[in-house]
């Protein structure tokens, strides 16, 4: 039985993690975010009502679940307050269900200013960040000058630390990027206005999770972004600023690494990517347009159109390695309905003519990589909302089986629509 289950993306994010976390939390006592910030965008559809969460874990809609933001998450007080208000206006008692680690680094206005100034300065070489201050906040953490939730317990000391770090960053903003300084008093006042709310939710997350483990409670760890955006293992420098792989669970929450029981990789039936960076199977033709339109491929956080392409099993195999995946949840299979043929990338042809079945690491090494495809018959029947495997067309079943063969990982869950009821659970991770 798997008490500690990790749910993470196996591609470049936007795989459909939020819905699956929400579905599986029916049995969980805790849902934990362990990396990223409000650059994530998790969309849940329950009884036709749509909820988009950026920072708060997807378990917040369940009254039986306690949601936890772990130390690996960079926390924007402004974003958290906005999200809390939206949920509380709908009658969801967020403060009764949400806990925070005091070690969460804070994202403040100067981080956002730095993020946007840098992207503008990069010009054509812009990474395509969400402009939310995520990267600069992680930089401050590593440089040991970052302010954390725990600093808010001593308001006087917080004000002194804030002044010091803002002098440092404002010097850079004004003298290097030639933009306006961020106002110290405003940042201080805004943060102090919500300090008591934040500190009232603080808990020792590592201790809580260890006690939960000893009791045998079910815990779900919710990843944000995707494996191929990992700061260490992704398409660097076109990556996010945190560890999106399963290793981030231990460092970003305080759970001992030996206690992860099952890692569920969310796998979209085709590939998408937001922002710049390598994408060997990207389609620029009418099929790419079809996938974008049918899949409604626009970012939940930025509204940007996602780049679309065929499923890349070479890249997915890298995700299998990095995360020691136990099983897949295949999402958005219905988007492929109506295509005469579907393709799977099974290898890459390198610029020197070699065929390889593993991904390069640095983004520069992906230049000139061509996908080698395996073509399979498509299906005309609708798979949307199908709740039983026997209701799927044979061609769709063949596609599923081939993915399992190419990756060596079973598909344990199949999602056929945005609602939590439109799902086939072939093997429940908590029972695995």
Curated annotation (Swiss-Prot):
GO biological process, one term: IMP metabolic process
SMART domains: Adenylsucc_synt (SM00788)
Listed PROSITE patterns: ADENYLOSUCCIN_SYN_1, ADENYLOSUCCIN_SYN_2
Keywords: Cytoplasm, GTP-binding, Ligase, Magnesium, Metal-binding, Nucleotide-binding, Purine biosynthesis
Free-text cofactor note: Binds 1 Mg(2+) ion per subunit.
UniProt catalytic activity: IMP + L-aspartate + GTP = N(6)-(1,2-dicarboxyethyl)-AMP + GDP + phosphate + 2 H(+)
Ligand binding (GTP): 13-19, 41-43, 306, 332-334, 415-417
Family in the record: Belongs to the adenylosuccinate synthetase family.
Name of the protein in question: Adenylosuccinate synthetase
Organism: Salmonella agona (strain SL483)
């Amino acid at each position: 039985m798997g008490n500690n289950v990790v749910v993470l993306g196996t591609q470049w994010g936007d795989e459909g993690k939020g819905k699956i976390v929400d579905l599986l939390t029916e049995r969980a006592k805790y849902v934990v975010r362990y990396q990223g910030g409000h650059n994530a965008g998790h969309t849940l559809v329950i009884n036709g009502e749509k909820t988009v969460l950026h920072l708060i874990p997807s378990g917040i809609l369940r009254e039986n679940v306690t949601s936890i933001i772990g130390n690996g998450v960079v926390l924007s007080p402004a974003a958290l307050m906005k999200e809390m208000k939206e949920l509380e206006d709908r009658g969801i008692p967020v403060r009764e269900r949400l806990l925070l680690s005091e070690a969460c680094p804070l994202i403040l206005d100067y981080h956002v200013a730095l993020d946007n100034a840098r992207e503008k300065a990069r010009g054509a070489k812009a990474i395509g960040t969400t402009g939310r201050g995520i990267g600069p906040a992680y930089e401050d953490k590593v440089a040991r000058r970052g302010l954390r939730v725990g600093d808010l317990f001593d308001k006087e000391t917080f004000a002194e630390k804030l002044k010091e770090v803002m002098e440092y960053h404002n010097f850079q903003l004004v003298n290097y990027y030639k933009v306006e300084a961020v106002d110290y008093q405003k940042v201080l006042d805004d943060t102090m206005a919500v300090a008591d709310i934040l500190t009232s939710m603080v808990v020792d997350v590592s201790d809580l999770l260890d006690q939960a483990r000893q009791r045998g409670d079910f815990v779900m760890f919710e990843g944000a972004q995707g494996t191929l955006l990992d700061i260490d293992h992704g398409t660097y420098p076109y990556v996010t600023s945190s560890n999106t792989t399963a290793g981030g669970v231990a460092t970003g929450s305080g759970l001992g690494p030996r206690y992860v029981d099952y890692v569920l990789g969310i796998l979209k039936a085709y590939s998408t990517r937001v922002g710049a960076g390598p994408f060997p199977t990207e389609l620029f033709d009418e099929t790419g347009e079809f996938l974008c339109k049918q899949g409604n491929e626009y970012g939940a956080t930025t509204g940007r159109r996602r780049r679309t392409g065929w499923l890349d099993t070479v890249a997915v195999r890298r995700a299998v390695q990095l995360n020691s995946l136990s099983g897949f949840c295949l999402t958005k299979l219905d988007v492929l309905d109506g295509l005469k043929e579907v393709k799977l990338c099974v290898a890459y042809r390198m610029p020197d003519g070699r065929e390889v079945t593993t991904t390069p690491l640095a983004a520069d090494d992906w230049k000139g990589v061509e996908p080698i495809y395996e073509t399979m018959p498509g299906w005309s029947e609708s798979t949307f909302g199908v709740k039983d495997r026997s209701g799927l067309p044979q061609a769709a079943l063949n596609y599923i089986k081939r993915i399992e063969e190419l990756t060596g990982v079973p598909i344990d869950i199949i999602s056929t629509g945005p609602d939590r009821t439109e799902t086939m659970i072939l093997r429940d991770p908590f029972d695995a």
